[in-house]
Curated annotation (Swiss-Prot):
One of its GO terms (biological process) is division septum assembly. This is Probable septum site-determining protein MinC. Belongs to the MinC family. Interacts with MinD and FtsZ. InterPro entries: CAP/MinC_C (IPR016098), MinC (IPR013033), MinC_C_sf (IPR036145), MinC_N (IPR007874), Septum_form_inhib_MinC_C (IPR005526).
Amino acid sequence: MMVYIMNAFDIKSTKMDVLSISLHTSDLFDLEDVLVKLGKKFQESGVVPFVLDVQEFDYPESLDLAALVSLFSRHGMQILGLKHSNERWAAAAMKYHLLFCLSHSENVKELGQVEVQKTEDGQKARKTVLITSPVRTGQQVYAEDGDLIVTGAVSQGAELIADGNIHIYAPMRGRALAGAKGDTSARIFIHSMQAELVSVAGIYRNFEQDLPNHLHKQPVQILLQDNRLVISAIGSE
């Protein structure tokens, strides 16, 4: 008899404090010399996780990623993912079982723009990150302390995160996590609802099956009511 365990685990949004290594050379011998000295500090602390920032390199072929990951690992520095502003690096990250992170500053410059609004007294209000290009599988976009607006399609396996609201004016097939810092008033607005997972302030729902016809591939809004996620068609009473 096969037994299924329900609620065996929960999926929640989280933020990890992970150090970033900005790589300036592809020379493994030069890196080895530095790591022999620096690595002792990390070896004493056990394995320390890092994201490898490869922004200074245009193409994955310019680096021996397998050797780099192995080199850092030998010195107590575990590479969890790659960071770059160009999506071509996502495939390289997947090849070596690494996460891929879009460089936030470069991502904003290449894909969209940031608008910082001001209140009447001149104080900075919530800023808005605008992404006009498609967000592809493996990419993550994070709007810190503000709202996120996306006008391009969001692929399955892509992730949108905002401390405020999320607006998606295109088909949404990935994950959307609003109110990432706990804002329970945050909302998610989707033009064509096909998401894998949605979350508001850590309360999530994943979708293993299509929603009812009045919601699937329709404009919807997602919000919290009484600590529960509510998904409703936009324009419905």
